[in-house]
């Protein structure tokens, strides 16, 4: 799949320049971005379930980050706790809508961010249904606690929020570029 995704410049450089997400990166590449987010989240959750069980915590040097296992039965910030099946159904609907939007997005940044967010959303949904803390009990495995940020979170949350941020910034940037006045032809400035 990597050979399919290659082009003359990196995806990051194209995203920074607001390039159109055309033929240079076929659908397989964008789905690969989502799969990368999903698999990396699953791997880190598997590690956390093994390394942080029985209340074990790891303090990262500097004291700002602490790794600890938390079962989150709700959505973001614990919203919806107690209604795990509703949270799962709503999550699935939002992931499908986000995937459709990401597939139709017009810029590299929008597609990149959209597919990262889809992978993150799927990571939490799969965790909610399959994993031991979830295991059809509806919980998501959270394991990263930052002292200045209230909820404990996981890599899927980072992919989801970071992806949405990249997509929104890309959309705003491309919108701004489309609205910018075009200099008259022959104007050397």
Residue map of PLM features:
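Alpha-helical transmembrane bundles and membrane-interface segments of multipass inner-membrane proteins
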Residues: 1-189
């Amino acid at each position: 799949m990597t050979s399919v995704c290659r082009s003359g410049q990196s995806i990051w450089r194209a995203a920074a320049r607001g390039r159109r997400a055309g033929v240079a990166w076929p659908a397989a590449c964008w789905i690969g971005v989502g799969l990368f987010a999903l698999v990396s989240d699953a791997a880190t959750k598997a590690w956390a379930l093994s390394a942080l069980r029985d209340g074990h915590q790891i303090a990262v040097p500097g004291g700002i980050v602490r790794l600890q296992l938390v079962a989150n039965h709700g959505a973001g910030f614990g919203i919806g706790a107690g209604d795990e099946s509703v949270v799962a159904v709503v999550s699935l609907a939002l992931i499908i809508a986000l995937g459709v939007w990401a597939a139709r997005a017009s810029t590299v940044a929008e597609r990149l961010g959209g597919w990262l967010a889809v992978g993150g959303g799927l990571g939490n949904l799969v965790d909610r249904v399959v994993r031991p803390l979830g295991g059809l009990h509806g919980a998501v495995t959270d394991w990263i606690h930052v002292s200045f940020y209230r909820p404990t979170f996981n890599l899927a949350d980072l992919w989801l929020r970071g992806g949405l941020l990249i997509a929104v910034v890309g959309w705003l940037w491309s919108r701004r570029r489309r609205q910018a006045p075009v200099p008259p032809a022959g104007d050397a400035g």
